[in-house]
Amino acid sequence: MQEDVRRIALSLPGASEAGDRFAFSVLNKGRQKGFAWVWMEHVEPKKPRVQNPAVLAIRVANDLEKEVLLRSDDRKFFSEPHYNGFPAVLVRLAAIDVGELEELVTNAWLCQAPRALRETFLGER
């Protein structure tokens, strides 16, 4: 499923993949803005977080959208205290189909992309 994430994310205008981990961002006002990244799971207390390739963190527009997703299906979407107050949800990749994944990644990109890029992209659809 990570190959699907990569294919979808990199098909979006201006999207790039981080060199050091599985994460995608878009340049906005001179800074890379992340829209999808591998979940860094806290497996053991007092130890560094480790990548969990089965879970993707996805940026959402706001807390309301986050709550809607979290309440929609807890088999697919969840959160953890690290993400409290931050507009992102955690997605179990095995629980969603490619169509849902494409919608989630595209919406996440729309949250972070500069307005001109969003308008061009939406105008072409």
Locate the predicted segments by residue.
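Charge-dense, helix-prone N-terminal extensions
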Residues: 1-125
